[in-house]
């Protein structure tokens, strides 16, 4: 296999990342020597990221075979990580021997806000925030499809009231959007569709000849006591991060192996390794991230990966009591934490869960905080500090804009969210040290990517 030279800080051991950066598609996984010439390509569609994660679905398998723990030149060699999904190679484009980045000097300018807009505008498909169908444009302040636009308009113009036959929590998708009108309308309002954008005097066939008589006392549109402040539509970067959010990954613990500390730690290490592959692919879809130098991208990822992993565990655990949801099929309570020797670490993570639960963390805030945690990395090996700072500013402004539009009652909410990041980093440091100690003991097999990311953090 040909070697690949990357311009990266010498203090990091990066041979495995080099292999991942130039990984081929399923048809041809050999690394071509041309990979050493990195040229920027246009950003991939978030759909490729979503589709690609299906490689790690419950029906898949994790390759945990092979020898473990041989020492060579002072570095511990681990197992091969699971194959990288072909449609979204790490930090690069798709297809065999596709160079990572295309020279976009003619289309991308230096201002990160403009870069973000370029990346968003280059997306081939914008999705409806209500049902997930392809959006035809921005309607009533939100990216939405023609069907949801028409539904919202009919509801407001007809002043129609719906009732949910279930628990007001029906899932609204392209296929099921007609199954519950009440939940569909609530979803329209939740994503930011503006009632004020619908003209009440306009009906099929033109304007009404006579003005509609409205009882101001009973009308929610005219009664000042019932009028709610109009929420702004989502910030477009937040909307983009929602679309780019990867699908679930499952732990798939071996049911034939009895529970023990070794089984628990092996399951978590394998899960973390597969999540790392997805995180690196996800980072590429953060507006402005791919415009950083390759070295700075790797530095940010190597510094913030554990924070991103822990934030995911925290968000999945918000609806649970004193349990951590590492994956939907792997939930740890206090007894299981003791068995795995993770009680102190899990208690620290539960403190984060408690904090975010009290703040009623929303998915939009979760995906934005993940991106901010990556950009706010404490790495000392950043080459272009100004470019990274501008990326941080863009993401901070996106969070502030979202909070200003969705939580007008709490003007300090964005600041409160950012104030949780130091505790997240502190918990991340504790987790890295714990798993590094496990690595030194040599009792649990670890994949190469997970090993090298651990070593980069210590």
Swiss-Prot record:
Coiled coil: none annotated. Orphan receptor that acts as a transcription activator in the absence of bound ligand. Binds specifically to an estrogen response element and activates reporter genes controlled by estrogen response elements. Induces the expression of PERM1 in the skeletal muscle. Residues 42-52 have a biased composition (Polar residues). Changing residue 45 to D: No change in sumoylation nor transcriptional activity. The keyword Manganese does not apply. The gene is ESRRG. This is Estrogen-related receptor gamma. PROSITE patterns: NR_LBD (PS51843), NUCLEAR_REC_DBD_1 (PS00031), NUCLEAR_REC_DBD_2 (PS51030). One of its GO terms (biological process) is positive regulation of transcription by RNA polymerase II. Expressed in the heart, kidney, brain, lung, bone marrow, adrenal gland, trachea, spinal cord and thyroid gland. The lineage of its organism: Eukaryota, Metazoa, Chordata, Craniata, Vertebrata. One of its GO terms (molecular function) is estrogen response element binding. GO terms for cellular component: chromatin; nucleoplasm; nucleus. SUPFAM superfamilies: Glucocorticoid receptor-like (DNA-binding domain), Nuclear receptor ligand-binding domain. Acetylated by PCAF/KAT2 (in vitro). Residues 125-200 bind DNA. It is found in: Nucleus. It comes from Homo sapiens. Residues 42-85 are annotated as: Disordered.
